[in-house]
């Protein structure tokens, strides 16, 4: 079902009071946050934060240096809040399944911005995995991360 369909259709119950899931076309009101999912989110968040900090140290532009510094600080705060809220949903700690993270080392601004666009798409796709009703807190923090990225991309349009 397309995510933009009316909430009336999305909230309609089927036989046995079931809600739509990916398998039966409905979403559960009580989502299961698997350890694998949490571990993957942590890995992606750490990779992007490290990439931003690395580019921050490498750039020769003072404006980019300041913009990446602000992006890192804001994203770091929002990532921390995102993971803590996610952990609070089921009170289970993360056992990292993915023990290695990639150190993404963009060679130039174009490569760096391309990675930022990919990360933005990763964030927008979270709507597919989180329940809009049960996870509105997590998705609100995700929106804060998107705001950080979009503001940063605007700042990157300046010449100096």
Annotate the PLM regions:
Residues 63-95:
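Conserved alpha-helical segments that form or flank metal/cofactor-binding pockets of metalloenzymes
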Residues 47-70, 129-135:
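Helix-loop segments that flank and shape redox-cofactor active sites
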Residues 52, 82, 123-126:
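Non-transmembrane amphipathic alpha-helical segments
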Residues 48, 53, 70-74, 78, ...:
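Extended, well-ordered alpha-helical scaffold segments
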């Amino acid at each position: 079902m397309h995510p933009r369909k009316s909430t009336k259709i999305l909230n309609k119950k089927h036989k046995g009071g079931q809600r739509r899931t990916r398998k039966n076309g409905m979403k559960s009101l009580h989502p299961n946050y698997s350890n694998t999912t949490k571990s993957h989110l942590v890995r992606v968040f750490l990779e992007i934060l490290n990439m931003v900090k690395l580019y921050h140290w490498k750039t020769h532009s003072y404006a980019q240096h300041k913009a990446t510094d602000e992006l890192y600080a804001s994203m770091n705060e929002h990532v921390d809040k995102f993971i803590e809220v996610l952990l609070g949903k089921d009170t289970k700690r993360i056992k990292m399944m993915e023990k290695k993270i990639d150190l993404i080392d963009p060679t130039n601004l174009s490569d760096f911005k391309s990675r930022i666009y990919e990360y933005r798409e990763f964030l927008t796709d979270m709507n597919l995995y989180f329940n809009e009703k049960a996870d509105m807190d997590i998705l609100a923090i995700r929106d804060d991360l998107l705001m950080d990225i979009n503001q940063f991309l605007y700042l990157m349009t300046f010449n100096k």
